[in-house]
Amino acid sequence: MSAHEPHTSLVRPAAKAWHARLELGFERQPGGRTALAHRRHVGPLRVQRALYPEGDAICHAVIVHPPGGVAGGDRLEIDVRLDAGTHAVLTTPGATKWYKSNGLDARQRIDIDVGAHAKLDWLPQNNLFFDAAHASLEFVLALGDGASVLGWDATQLGRQAAGEAWSAGSIASFSKIVGPSGRPLWVERARLDAGDPLRAAPQGLGGFAVYGTLWALGAACTEALAESIAPALPFDDALRAGVTCVAPGTLLIRALAHSMEALQRLLAEQWLALRPIVHGVDPKPLRLWQT
């Protein structure tokens, strides 16, 4: 899992902007198999074939974006539906690169519906924002009765491997997690500009260029669980993390780092530790991460 990218400057003309949409639907078949029963794509978003490294009950799939990056004017939409009793593990093969803007914002919307007693592991690789990238990101997740979810998002500002800082640009983000009754469990709206003083402020990013959030959702996600996790989380000059139970059944781990590798290791470790507790299944590292 690496955020290292070669030094390139890519600005695609607005006339060639991609508008892409991917729909995925999982259903429970006789015998308890989770099947990828619906897939539909428009434009350059795809899903690789379903895999079952953990047996028929858990369907693994990899979402791919062949262009490799997102430029100004691009619009990506991902719609995922899990029927009752299914279990899906979704990831991506590499970082999503957000290129220098051509004067237009790049946009992404992710909409996920997790049915009753369904389980989801949402494990994308990180977002990597090039200098002068302008992006708008929206993420909405709805939970059915008895559903559980483990997922994360991770962001890197600037291409560290190329010696590039994120000195210009903006990121507008909106995240919402909704419970079975339709009541919001967690809502966050933010706008980060490259010149924002909060990037250096201790109550903001504290000078870190890498940050991420892991969310754990389900009946097992209690204040007591958060308190049991907190003592082992790092808090030093290289990596800082904390955990909060923001609502019954809703636990967040948030972290800041100077390198994406350190953040990804932390997120993966916490996901593996939480999986037996939240989903009731064995911890199993993704094969994709081992290639």
UniProtKB/Swiss-Prot annotation:
Subcellular location: Cytoplasm
GO annotations of cellular component type: cytoplasm
GO terms assigned for molecular function: nickel cation binding
Family from the record: Belongs to the UreD family.
Purpose: Required for maturation of urease via the functional incorporation of the urease nickel metallocenter.
Quaternary structure, from the entry: UreD, UreF and UreG form a complex that acts as a GTP-hydrolysis-dependent molecular chaperone, activating the urease apoprotein by helping to assemble the nickel containing metallocenter of UreC. The UreE protein probably delivers the nickel.
Name listed for the protein in its UniProt record: Urease accessory protein UreD
Gene it is expressed from: ureD
